[in-house]
Swiss-Prot record:
This is High-affinity lysophosphatidic acid receptor. It comes from Xenopus laevis. Residues 60-80, 130-149, 220-268, 325-372 are cytoplasmic. Belongs to the G-protein coupled receptor 1 family. SUPFAM superfamilies: Family A G protein-coupled receptor-like. Keywords: Cell membrane, G-protein coupled receptor, Glycoprotein, Membrane, Receptor, Transducer, Transmembrane, Transmembrane helix.
Length: 372
């Protein structure tokens, strides 16, 4: 019986013949290229595992770091760790050997785990984005650690329910030699296409739309606030001076209103969103083409494109901990604490001693830049 796909690249369609001859993946990439890709993949696995493990360890060991936003970031890091352990190694072996060596049952399980952990990471990023929207645009800071834990638990359950059909509904499975990766593949069954579209919409298009709207609103709010503060800063300061009976004195210098604590965390999440979009847009388009285009699915370039787009989704797991250490000072300092002294090449920069607690605080003009 020929193998096409239902929702997975390795699932069978009983009544559909294959129009083109299978490809031998051992000749899809040259041996030197496969070795280079394997080395890069191993480095990606190491960075994704160690970097995200440090993030989780920091939040676990330091009670001061267990804020709502850090709990969410730790959950995002944990989902990336699971990807690096249960999905990325098998992709590396497939690239080296040119075939799937782990059996059809594990291929189903592997596909389910891939979507499970990806959905969880996307759900956490969506929660963080909506939280930033509520704080900056709506002036509502309602997410505390307890509520964050509830939302994390709910996101795990929802992600599991969405990814579960990938492994429950398909029992007759074989791994085609032409593309032994468990990805969405061509199907003519309406139910399978509906599930595939639902999966891609849940993973990319809904989160992307909601986050894009949130960030556009946030950017507009920050811009309007900056203009308003700049316009009224001088009059506010002069009003304070007049109360002291000092109107005859020289006008004070323009006060510097600190908006950094309000925007820096948002900027970090915006960078994560941009990384998510760049890494997942190609794979989402690729997956939809695989489901609906027989010509594309059986083209000679399918395996190469599939490998590249899959790699991009893995890169997100590698970049996230790098972004945390780059953008979040407390994470950077904690990372330096975990590193041996001989590897501490970054200079110790004295940080500010205070930080604001509630991001929805209204700012007023002051003589010194406020601490973050």
């Amino acid at each position: 019986m020929g193998c096409n796909n239902t929702a997975l690249d390795n699932c069978m369609l009983p009544n559909l013949s294959i129009a083109t001859a299978p490809l031998d993946l051992r000749f899809a990439f040259s041996t030197p290229l496969r070795m280079l890709l394997a080395i890069i993949m191993i480095l990606m696995i190491a960075i994704a595992f160690l970097g995200n493990a440090i993030v989780c360890l920091i939040v676990y060991q330091k009670p001061a770091m267990r804020s709502a936003i850090n709990l969410l970031l730790a959950t995002l890091a944990f989902s990336d760790i699971m990807l690096s352990l249960f999905c990325m190694p098998f992709t590396a072996v497939t690239i080296i050997t040119g075939s799937w060596l782990f059996g059809t049952q594990f291929c189903q399980i592997s596909a389910m785990l891939y979507w499970f952990f990806v959905l969880e990471g996307v759900a956490i990023l969506l929660i963080i984005s909506v939280d930033r929207f509520l704080i900056i645009v709506q002036r509502q800071d309602k997410l505390n650690p307890h509520r964050a834990k509830i939302m994390i638990a709910a996101s795990w359950v929802l992600s599991f329910c969405i990814s579960l059909p990938s492994v429950v509904g398909w029992t007759l499975v074989e791994v085609p030699t032409r593309a032994p990766q468990c990805v969405l593949g061509y199907t003519e069954f309406s139910a399978d296409r509906v599930y595939a579209v639902m999966l891609i919409v849940a993973v990319f298009f809904i989160p992307f739309s909601v986050m894009l709207y949130s960030y556009l609103c946030i950017l507009n709010t920050v811009r309007r606030n900056a203009v308003r503060i700049h316009t009224h800063a001088d009059s506010l300061c002069l009003s304070q001076v007049s109360k002291l009976g000092l109107m005859g004195l020289q006008r004070p210098h323009q006060m510097n209103v600190d908006m950094s604590f309000k925007t820096r965390a948002f900027t970090t999440i915006l960078i994560l969103f941009i990384g998510f979009s760049l890494c997942w847009l190609p794979h989402s388009v690729f997956s939809l083409l695989s489901v609906f285009s027989r010509t594309f699915y059986y083209s000679s370039s399918f395996y190469s494109i599939s490998t590249c787009t899959l790699w991009l989704t893995y890169l997100k797991s590698v970049f996230n901990p790098v972004i945390y250490c780059w953008r979040i000072k407390k994470f950077r300092e904690a990372c330096l604490e975990f590193m041996p002294k001989t590897f501490k090449i970054l200079p110790n920069v004295r940080g500010r001693t205070r930080r604001r607690i509630r991001p929805s605080t209204i700012y007023v003009c002051g003589e010194h830049q406020s601490a973050v």
